[in-house]
Structures are given as structure tokens and as C-alpha cells.
């Protein structure tokens, strides 16, 4: 899941950096709604990680675009023990960080980032209900 986004962003970034962001979003969207699996796919968390990894390398050339959301993921996971909540917080953090750092450069990059965050949160809507009801699964190994 991570690799498909890294490859998409990496290849397209050779030609157009802004288009590489959309290639990453398209790969994540395709992961969530695969044609050959009846449009039933994942929750875009692994592909979001691939998006952040690949854009950190190819588009932004700064590891901070990956480190900041990953640090938030780890802190929220340690505090709340819920992977779903941690994933959504990391997605929000990534878009906020990209907005702060890139808005003056490219609205397209910011828009693609927010669309990916919305996709991640939308795919976790059942988990949001469980969190509200106090029935979301928690990890026990941390």
C-alpha cells in the first residue's frame, strides 16, 4: 500500500511536482475504492503514510512533512491507545502542516492534502461512532 503511492508520486514528480501530489491522492483513492474488489478497500492510512513519505522525499525534500504527523500519531496512540484516532489526528496534522508550509507556494498541494485527510476521516466514520460510544478497540501492547 505504501509502495504504490511512493511509486506513483516518484514517477510523476520527474515530470511535474504538483501533478505528483494528485498522483498520490489518486493512488490513495484507488486503494479505498478498488474497481476489482467491488469498490471496497482500505481506510487510506497506509497510503497516507506512503503519500507523506513520498512527498517528503520527492516534492518537499524535507523529512518534517513525515516526521511531524508521525510524531502526532505516536503521541496520540500512546495517550489514547486507539489506532483509528491516532491515524485521523496524524492526517489532520499533516494537512495543517502542509497548509502552513505550502499555502504561499501552491494551493493545489494544500487542496490535495486536505482531500486526502477528508478521505481518511470519511473512511473512519464507523470508528468515530465507536469512539463516541466508548466501544472503540484499544491496543494493549503499549
Which residues does each predicted region cover?
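Multi-pass membrane catalytic core of lipid/isoprenoid biosynthesis enzymes
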Residues: 1-13, 23, 68
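Loop-to-transmembrane alpha-helix initiation sites
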Residues: 65-69, 83-90, 104-116
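Glycine-rich phosphate/pyrophosphate-binding loop and the adjoining helix
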Residues: 103-112, 120-130
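Membrane-embedded alpha-helical segments of multi-pass transporters/permeases
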Residues: 9, 36, 95, 99, ...
Amino acid at each position: 500500500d505504501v509502495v504504490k503511492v511512493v511509486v506513483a508520486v516518484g514517477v510523476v514528480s520527474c515530470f511535474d511536482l504538483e501533478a505528483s501530489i494528485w498522483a498520490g491522492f489518486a493512488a490513495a483513492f484507488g486503494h479505498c475504492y478498488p474497481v476489482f474488489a467491488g469498490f471496497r478497500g482500505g481506510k487510506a492510512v497506509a497510503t497516507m503514510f506512503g503519500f507523506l513519505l513520498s512527498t517528503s522525499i520527492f516534492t518537499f525534500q524535507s523529512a518534517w512533512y513525515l516526521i511531524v504527523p508521525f510524531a502526532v500519531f505516536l503521541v496520540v496512540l500512546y495517550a489514547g491507545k486507539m489506532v483509528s484516532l491516532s491515524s485521523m489526528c496524524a492526517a489532520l496534522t499533516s494537512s495543517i502542516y502542509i497548509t502552513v508550509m505550502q499555502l504561499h507556494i501552491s494551493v493545489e498541494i494544500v487542496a490535495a492534502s486536505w482531500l486526502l485527510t477528508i478521505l481518511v476521516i470519511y473512511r473512519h466514520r464507523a470508528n468515530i461512532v465507536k469512539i463516541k460510544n466508548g466501544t472503540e478497540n484499544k491496543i494493549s501492547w503499549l
